[in-house]
């Protein structure tokens, strides 16, 4: 991690998180500018954080009493103090930082745009391999694969020849594969990775 980019809760930096430094919105803008309900919704939807309300209450209180939160360590410490202590391999700030990063960089929208574009330029019998690192990404990818797999459904009461029913334009090569224990031991960041692979077998839909 590069501390100056503000992605890490373990390295002190400005609360930035922009992958593209030319864009305006930063993580600090969100943390200091969003109202209570909007922040809670963000942490629930993009971080799947069950302690979202506790965290946001702590953020709002900090803003009212001490002012803006401008450093990554400030926010991480605040989160650590706000939620119940429990044994976990993940830092308590992980989900909040994930939610902020996703929002700042519009990561889910990027995935939704890239998948159909990648499929469109894929040659016949070409394969599309996609790795996700959290459930929100994987859900989008899984649904895209499922959409491509689903053939047009026609009622049995409609007189149509089977040959005229459009078949799925893909076949699944890897439904979902997780890293081995050996791989995780060499690269701890691989622990949440999921690989899905499809092959294009017709132009289809």
Residue ranges with predicted function:
Residues 1-205:
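S-adenosyl-L-methionine-dependent methyltransferase catalytic core, i.e., the SAM/SAH-binding region
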